[in-house]
Amino acid sequence: MTKLFDSRLADVIRKPVITEKATNALDLNQYTFEVDHRAAKPEIKAAIEALFSVKVIGVNTMNPPRRTRRVGKFSGKRSQVKKAIVRLAEGDKIQLFPES
């Protein structure tokens, strides 16, 4: 991979999504991340494999609708988010929570 491509991979993944549904999916070896809305599935797969040194089996993405936000009489929209559910190979793990 080129150096420019490697620096782009770090910008693809924004943050992990920590919800009840996403936490329950950890038992199925599926991890949920908020990603750049322009990222494609191969980019997301390459970014996860490069950043966490794991083998990705599949990537599912979703673009939920933008939510409207009002401040007084002014109406606007929240920024576009894209979620990716990444399924890892058997035996691979990503450490999201610190060990106690």
From Swiss-Prot:
SUPFAM superfamilies: Ribosomal proteins S24e, L23 and L15e. PROSITE patterns: RIBOSOMAL_L23. Part of the 50S ribosomal subunit. Contacts protein L29, and trigger factor when it is bound to the ribosome. Pfam families: Ribosomal_L23. InterPro entries: Nucleotide-bd_a/b_plait_sf, Ribosomal_uL23-like, Ribosomal_uL23/eL15/eS24_sf, Ribosomal_uL23_CS. Belongs to the universal ribosomal protein uL23 family. GO terms for molecular function: rRNA binding; structural constituent of ribosome. This is Large ribosomal subunit protein uL23. It comes from the Bacteria. NCBIfam families: PRK05738.1-3, PRK05738.2-4, PRK05738.3-1, PRK05738.3-2, PRK05738.3-4. One of the early assembly proteins it binds 23S rRNA. One of the proteins that surrounds the polypeptide exit tunnel on the outside of the ribosome. Forms the main docking site for trigger factor binding to the ribosome. It comes from Prochlorococcus marinus (strain MIT 9215). GO terms for cellular component: ribonucleoprotein complex; ribosome. PANTHER family: 60S RIBOSOMAL PROTEIN L23A (PTHR11620). One of its GO terms (biological process) is translation.
